[in-house]
């Protein structure tokens, strides 16, 4: 992160960053399909302490690079049932408060659109709602994708009126070996181009 800030500043790039921590799990999650690790209480305590240090480091970097960093994030996809790096909501809330007090920057949290309905306690502490949307992974084709994004954006706006909402992750795969979640034939460069062009046109028009 610090090197990225330096490059932006030294090269005079007209851009700023959202800075977030690399949180690791503070709870065991048997619902994660690919990580069945059962951490001991002592290991979970050590992992929580590591997250606390990461938040402290984030505050330091944000303050030392205030001209380049425009917002700070509490975490990234730390609440889904399938998540590998889940963190209790009360801990995420405490991180949000620490970041707001420690940096003075707008505070956000990055999570999949379908999780935000259940995150009101956390959202109350945030200045910005950052959403991730991947219609292809949810079985939609490229013709449906933009309407899916519009629908989710409208829902999140209804859940949290008055909160700015940004798409912090969007994407369209160009290849996939496993089509269990995707419609076969949809992951290709042509569809990716179409998806991005339609998405940016819509988001620019709506000033999202």
PLM features: what roles do these ranges have?
Residues 1-2, 172:
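Gly/Ser/Thr-rich loops at beta-strand to alpha-helix junctions
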Residues 2-4, 53-60, 110-121, 147-155, ...:
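Alpha-helical scaffolding within the catalytic cores
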Residues 3-105:
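Substrate-binding cleft of extracellular glycoside hydrolase catalytic domains
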Residues 7, 32-33, 85-89, 122-124, ...:
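Short, glycine/charged-enriched secondary-structure capping and boundary segments
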Residues 19-21, 25, 30, 69-70, ...:
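Aromatic- and acid-rich polysaccharide-binding/catalytic face
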Residues 61-64, 120, 163-168:
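Short, functional N-terminal and low-complexity linear motifs
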Residues 97-101, 106, 125-208:
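Substrate-binding and catalytic surfaces of secreted/luminal carbohydrate-active proteins
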């Amino acid at each position: 992160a610090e090197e990225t800030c330096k490059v932006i500043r030294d090269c005079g790039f007209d851009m700023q960053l959202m800075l977030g921590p690399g949180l690791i799990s503070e709870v065991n999650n048997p619902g994660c399909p690919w990580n069945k690790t059962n951490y001991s209480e002592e290991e979970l305590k050590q992992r929580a302490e590591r997250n606390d240090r990461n938040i402290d480091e984030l505050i330091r970097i944000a303050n030392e690079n205030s001209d380049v960093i425009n917002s700070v994030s509490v975490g990234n996809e730390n609440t889904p049932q399938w998540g590998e790096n889940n963190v209790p909501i009360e801990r995420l809330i405490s991180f949000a408060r620490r970041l707001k007090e420690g940096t003075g920057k707008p505070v956000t949290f990055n999570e999949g659109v379908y999780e935000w309905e259940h995150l009101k306690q956390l959202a109350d502490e945030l200045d910005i709602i950052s959403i991730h949307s991947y219609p292809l992974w949810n079985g939609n084709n490229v013709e449906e994708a933009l309407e899916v994004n519009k629908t989710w954006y409208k829902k999140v706006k209804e859940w949290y009126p008055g909160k700015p909402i940004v798409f912090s992750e969007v994407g369209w795969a160009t290849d996939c070996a496993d089509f269990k979640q995707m419609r076969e034939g949809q992951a290709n460069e042509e569809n990716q181009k179409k998806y991005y062009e339609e998405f940016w046109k819509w988001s620019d028009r709506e000033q999202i």
